[in-house]
Regions:
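Noncatalytic regulatory segments and standalone regulatory/sensor domains
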Residues: 26-32, 152-239
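Cysteine-nucleophile protease catalytic domains, especially the papain-like/related folds used
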Residues: 26-114, 118, 189-193, 205-209, ...
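Active-site-adjacent substructure of cysteine-protease-like catalytic cores
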Residues: 107, 111-160
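Structural marker of alpha-solenoid helical repeat scaffolds
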Residues: 229, 263-264, 297-298
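Alpha-solenoid helical repeat scaffolds
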Residues: 235-239, 269-273, 303-308
Length: 320
């Protein structure tokens, strides 16, 4: 799905478009106004939000620059244009928005596709970047905006959108426009912070993607936060060990991998990685034992474990 800048869709008669946007049943809005989630205040607006007015068709770079700025990453929309804007589509793909957030030092991750989840993120201090369709489903006009607040009593959502800062929109209208994107939304968070509404697999996938091109120490902080939220999760423990190693902290890496082997005694990758790091730390006996366990577990990691064991033995002989 692509997000196109405003102004490209065929214009509809104003009355027809108004009826389209406001008609129907905004079920999530009605439920929220009837009973807000526990702990969610009736009204909230994030303070000191950066604002960038979009250029023609470039709502993606502007919205992402605002979300990144709120996370402490100061980058101008113009610098994001080559990273996310596709001239032939006159818009930005969601996958590029997530990748660009990570490339610039923030954890870009989707949130749960629900209005209550959006409000929970705002309560946590996370502005939410949303994709809307401001026109007909059959003739979409995709648009990125940043949600910065809400008022349940008034039934309003507050956005930084297009060239308008602090745009107030009826929550029911917002829900209709957002629903047409499948309720797609993301947050861009500084290292060590996690979305409050995203599930474990969504966060893990985002961290793995960030690990590929992010600074190891930054990604490590977010892995550590996720490991605290979901203790004992193998993927998070391995990621924590990998990023600690990449950041130059071999003792920290060994600790993460060791905890992974204790929680998952049948994980060949955990034992193999532990063996590799222990060897570099000079603990050859423990390294050989870990590599032997990885080898004994067999499976697709058998060849890798054999290579690790041979590397350990060569290193040990070289020290004699």
């Amino acid at each position: 799905m692509e997000a196109r800048g405003a102004g490209r869709a065929r214009l509809l008669p104003a009355l027809a478009l108004s009826a389209l946007l406001l008609g129907g049943c905004a079920t999530q809005t009605a439920a929220l106004r009837a009973a807000a989630p526990p702990g969610v205040p009736p009204r909230l607006e994030l303070a000191a939000m950066p604002f960038f007015a979009q250029e023609r068709y470039q709502c993606g770079p502007a919205a992402l620059a605002m979300a990144l700025g709120a996370a402490g990453v100061l980058v101008a929309p113009d610098a994001l244009v080559p990273q996310v804007y596709l001239p032939e589509r006159e818009g930005s793909l969601q996958v590029e928005m997530l990748a660009a957030a990570r490339r610039n030092g923030a954890l870009g991750v989707t949130i749960a596709p629900r209005l209550d989840a959006l409000l929970e993120e705002l309560q946590a201090g996370h502005p939410v970047l949303v994709l809307q369709n401001l026109s007909l489903p059959i003739f979409p006009r995709w648009h990125y905006a940043v949600v910065t607040g809400y008022d349940l009593a008034q039934g309003d959502i507050v956005l930084n959108s297009g060239t308008t800062e602090h745009m107030v929109m009826a929550m029911s209208t917002f829900e209709h426009t957002w629903a047409r994107s499948g309720y797609w939304a993301m947050v861009a968070l500084p290292p060590g912070q996690l979305p409050v509404s995203s599930d474990k697999q969504t966060v893990l996938d985002a961290l793995v993607a960030w690990e590929r091109n992010g600074k190891p120490d930054a990604v490590r902080h977010s892995y550590a936060a996720a490991d605290r939220r979901w203790p004992g999760e193998l993927g998070l423990q391995l990621g924590l060990g990998n990023t600690a190693y990449a950041a130059g902290d071999r003792a920290g890496a060994a600790d993460a991998f060791r905890r992974a082997t204790l929680a998952h005694p049948d994980s060949a990758p955990a034992f193999n990685n532990l063996a590799f790091v222990l060897s570099e730390l000079g603990d050859y006996g423990a390294a050989r034992a870990a590599a032997g366990r990885a080898l004994a577990l067999g499976g697709p990691w058998r060849a890798e474990a054999q290579a690790t064991l041979e590397t350990i033995e060569r290193a040990e002989r070289g020290r004699r």
